Regions:
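Short coil/linker segments at helix-helix boundaries
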Residues: 1-4, 49-52, 57, 67, ...
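Helix-turn-helix repeat elements of alpha-solenoid scaffolds
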Residues: 2-13, 39-53, 82, 108-109, ...
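Residues within HEAT/ARM-like alpha-solenoid scaffolds
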Residues: 2-5, 9, 25-29, 65-68, ...
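A conserved hydrophobic secondary-structure block that centers on an alpha-helix together
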Residues: 10-61, 67
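Solenoid-like repeat scaffolds
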Residues: 15-25, 52-63, 91-99, 117-123, ...
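"A position-specific structural signal for the A-helix of alpha-solenoid helical repeats
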Residues: 28-29, 33, 68-79, 127-134, ...
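TPR/TPR-like (Sel1-like) alpha-helical repeat modules
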Residues: 78, 82-102, 146-157, 166-170
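Surface-exposed, low-hydrophobicity segments enriched in Gly/Pro/acidic/Ser residues
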Residues: 121-142, 154
Length: 183
């Protein structure tokens, strides 16, 4: 409880510092700390509204801060059950910002079939490719390869999904009791 009260007080101080700050470098970091604080407080709607009003189109911030803010934005959207929006952002992070690729992969959550279809309809071609890559890593690498091939037959990322498919096959063979024998 004391930590929550401290964080609420801190969020007020951070917001005041953000609003009064003129230096883009510091302002971006205040915004990041605000997003992080509201996320941990469970104030997801506040974080989403703040991001959309204050952070979304701020190209003066460093690339790292822009993507990290976007990651917390996606996390808050997910907590608000806006799964398609969150997963689309995670696909962008996975594709476009290598330092957070693992975070995007871990945070991405495949959807029910109907939601997945709607998500693909919202996505542009590049986002669709990223979505199928994530789908292949999570669920069915061969389906991921098939769909990425339809979008871009020269895409080299399909090799990763092929390795994933081989890993799954190896695991299934090694852990199959038919292949064990008693000495």
């Amino acid at each position: 409880v004391a930590d929550t009260l401290t964080l609420r007080q801190l969020s007020g101080e951070l917001k005041a510092a953000f609003m009064n700050c003129k230096d883009p470098f510091l302002k971006g970091r205040y915004g990041y700390q605000l997003m992080k604080t509201w996320h941990y407080l469970g104030e997801y709607e506040t974080a989403v509204q703040f991001y959309e009003a204050q952070l979304e189109n701020k190209t003066k911030f460093t690339t790292s801060i822009q993507w990290r803010n976007r990651g917390y934005y996606a996390a808050c959207l997910y907590k608000l059950k806006r799964y398609a929006d969150a997963n689309l952002i995670y696909a962008d992070i996975f594709r476009l910002y290598a330092p957070q690729r693992l975070d995007a992969y871990v945070s991405f959550h495949p959807l029910e079939e109907s939601d997945w279809t709607q998500l693909l309809a919202k996505a542009d071609k590049e986002q669709q490719r990223s979505l199928w890559m994530l789908y292949g890593l999570y669920n069915d690498p061969l389906k991921g390869i098939e769909e990425i091939f339809k979008l871009d037959p020269t895409n080299t990322e399909m090799e990763l999904l092929l390795v994933r498919a081989v890993n799954i096959a190896e695991f299934n063979i090694i852990n199959n009791p038919v292949y064990y024998w008693e000495e």
